[in-house]
Each structure stands twice: as C-alpha cells, then as structure tokens.
C-alpha cells in the first residue's frame, strides 16, 4: 500500500508540535565528535567561522518557519538552544537548518560522514517562567559545567548572554562553504536575531524581570560548576586547539530517558500536559489506523506534523485542557 511505501505504516510515539511553544533543543554530533569546534575560527585557514555557519543557517530558515532564538550555545560536539515556535513548524525548521549547517561544516573540515546523530535532535517543551529561565541559564552555563572555561564569556565559540534577551540583531554574510554563491538561492547577507519574544515578556512581566531570573539561575549554576571542577578548567586555548576529527573521551551515560516537557516542579501543569500528550497520541493512533484502512477523509489531532505537512491531511485546532 502507498502508506507502507511512504513510511506511515507504523508509528513509534507521535510528536506534537503546537504553535506558541517554548523548547529546549539539543543537537549532538555523531559519535560525540568535535565537528562544531571553534577551532581556528579567527585564523585565515577557513573562509568562515562555525559561528557564522550557525548564524547564517539559522537566520535563513527562522523567519520562514516562525522560529525565534532566545538562547544558544554551540559546543564543540553539540548545540544547545532555547527556541520559541510561533507556528508549530519547529520540526521543519530544524530539519532544514540542520541540513544546511551540516553541509557547510562538512565542507569546512572535509568530513566524509554525517555531522549530526539524528534528523532533527531532541526537543523538551518548557512550560512556566521557572522552567524557561532555568533552561536559558543552563544553555549559557554549559561550557562552564563541562569544565572547559571558567565563565561563559571565555567560551570562544557561539554563545548568547543574558543581555541578548533584550534583543540583538547582526548581519551575517553568506558563507563560502558549500552554498551556491547565487543571490537568488542564498541571500548575500541575512539578519540573525536573538532575544525574548513578546510571549516570554508577557509571561515574566518584563524583559528586565526575565533577565534577572535568568541571571540568578546562571550565577548558581556557574558557582556549582566551579566547586565541582575545583577551579580547574581546560581554558580557551585548549578549546581552540581541539581537532575537529577527534571525539570526546569523558564518560557519558547512554540509554537514559529524554524529557519531553519541563515544568520545574509545577505538578498541576505537568499532569495537564501529560494528559494532553496521551490524548494526542491516542487520537493520532486512531487517525493513522483509519488512513491505513484506506479511508481518505481523515482529520488528525492538533499539533500533527508529518501527516499534515508532508501528506496534506487536515488537523484539528488546538484547545488546551482545563487546569487540574
């Protein structure tokens, strides 16, 4: 049948993509390789820095898919981001953005294999001001928590700061790696924007309040990391000397659960979101079985991704469940 040939004959766990959602997104390099290292970013060995590659690819697709960047840290072998999805198209954005970024990185380092380990990475839905502020701080503190530098400001790669929540825009020139140097295909310059979306400002009351909460979480994380590493950090120069063909050697636990949502201790909200997720998966399973049975007029639940965007099936309008 057509649905088997097109990859919709079976379902693991359907993912729901709702407009107006905050996400923590993590994207790891295959086999923990340092393919995103800022290695020689300021030298003349490469035409573009990894930061430029990230910013161009992100700006290229963010406006198209309604994505706003709130915080980001590009580590040597993974990317941490906090994003706001205005249209429910985060999956499409990540697939397109990550493909362009991976292609440019491969050309930059002459890599023969894949750059990333999964098609679009893992998403963690953030609900509530505490969860959002904590994850933004986590992103900014990542190089310190990894024992690489003593402060976020020392990280030589792409990393955002608390001040960026007030909004910042930079012009990014088109990289020379991989991309067609054609103005119609790839704009010679794009605007990379980062900052708090108006929805976040409404949640926190003001950007200043949001920045204060993030700064508080960030300070605690940095102090804890410095105690844990006893003040011993690799340092900026060792980070810059990292070979893009090398891999991380530190122990990392595999096989753990990947969180799908974070409410930072708000149990009532967590129960509501879990109930919504279960209801969505049940409705999705029913709709998918109807498609497999040959029915043509099938409506999928709100937040359906692939079956709506790729195959054109209609989906319901999202209506939140009442609070418990």
For each predicted feature, which ranges?
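Short catalytic/metal-binding and nucleic-acid-binding patches
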Residues: 1-324
């Amino acid at each position: 049948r057509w649905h088997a040939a097109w990859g919709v004959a079976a379902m693991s766990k359907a993912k729901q993509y709702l407009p107006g959602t905050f996400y923590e997104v993590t994207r790891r390099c295959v086999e923990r390789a340092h393919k995103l290292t800022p290695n020689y970013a300021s030298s003349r060995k490469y035409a573009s820095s990894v930061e430029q590659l990230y910013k161009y690819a992100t700006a290229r697709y963010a406006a198209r898919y309604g994505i706003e960047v709130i915080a980001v840290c590009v580590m040597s072998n993974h990317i941490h981001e906090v994003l706001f999805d205005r249209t429910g198209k985060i999956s499409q954005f990540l697939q397109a953005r990550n493909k362009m970024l991976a292609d440019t990185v491969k050309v930059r380092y002459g890599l023969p294999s894949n750059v990333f380990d999964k098609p679009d990475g893992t998403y963690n839905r953030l609900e509530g001001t505490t969860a959002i502020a904590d994850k933004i701080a986590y992103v900014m503190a990542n190089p310190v928590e990894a024992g690489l530098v003593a402060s976020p400001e020392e990280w030589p790669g792409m990393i955002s700061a608390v001040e960026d929540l007030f909004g910042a825009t930079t012009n990014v020139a088109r990289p020379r790696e991989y991309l067609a140097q054609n103005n119609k295909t790839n704009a010679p310059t794009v605007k990379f924007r980062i900052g708090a979306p108006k929805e976040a400002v409404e949640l926190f009351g003001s950007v200043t309040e949001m920045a204060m909460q993030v700064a508080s979480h960030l300070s605690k994380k940095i102090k804890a990391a410095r105690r844990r590493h006893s003040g011993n950090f690799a340092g900026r120069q060792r980070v810059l000397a990292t070979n893009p063909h090398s891999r991380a050697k530190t122990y990392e636990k595999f096989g753990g659960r990947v969180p799908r949502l974070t409410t930072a201790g708000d149990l009532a909200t967590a129960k509501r979101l879990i109930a919504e997720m279960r209801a969505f998966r049940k409705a999705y399973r029913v709709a998918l079985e109807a498609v497999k049975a040959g029915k043509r007029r099938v409506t999928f639940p709100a937040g359906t991704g692939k079956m709506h965007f790729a195959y054109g099936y209609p989906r319901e309008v999202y209506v939140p469940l009442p609070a418990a």
